[in-house]
């Protein structure tokens, strides 16, 4: 009985350790994966034809994002809202390609970049974007704007 308890405890430790790794380890490969997603997404998002842009964004998201995030994005687009889940509805463009930075901090990836934005009065300005990106099972699962 004691041996079974030890084996179960060891198995539980292995499972918990695996779950922690899949939540995001911050290793160079994962940081580069998040960076590559935002590079590709910025190019797709910048396409002027909405139909082509949405198709390319969906394609990139299908590779790098969780099934749930992809499902929410498609559902939102078909309802006509077109909320941008990958940037927490801030947006991304070619300027982001030049200023994109990704670092791992306290269990999440912090993505920063500059974005050509426009205010309600249609005046252009450069926005500093900071996103907190959560990973699960080697896929982007959540994105939340911070600050």
Whereabouts are the PLM-identified features?
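Bacterial Sec-dependent N-terminal signal peptides
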Residues: 1-26
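Short beta-strand edge/turn micro-motifs at domain boundaries
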Residues: 122-147
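Short, well-ordered alpha-helical segments enriched in acidic and aromatic residues
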Residues: 47-76
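Short, aromatic-enriched amphipathic alpha-helices that serve as compact interaction elements
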Residues: 26-49
């Amino acid at each position: 009985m004691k041996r079974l308890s030890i084996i179960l405890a060891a198995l539980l430790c292995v499972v918990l350790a695996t779950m922690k790794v899949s939540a995001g380890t911050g290793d160079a490969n994962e940081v580069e994966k998040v960076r590559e997603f935002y590079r590709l997404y910025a190019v797709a998002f910048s396409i002027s034809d909405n139909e082509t842009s949405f198709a390319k964004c969906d394609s990139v998201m299908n590779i790098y994002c969780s099934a749930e995030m992809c499902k929410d994005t498609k559902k939102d687009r078909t309802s006509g809202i077109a909320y941008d889940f990958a940037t927490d509805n801030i947006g991304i463009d070619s300027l982001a390609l030049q200023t994109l930075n990704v670092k791992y901090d306290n269990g999440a990836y912090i993505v920063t970049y500059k974005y050509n934005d426009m205010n309600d009065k249609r005046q252009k300005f450069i926005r500093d974007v900071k996103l907190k990106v959560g990973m699960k099972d080697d896929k982007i699962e959540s994105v939340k704007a911070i600050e």
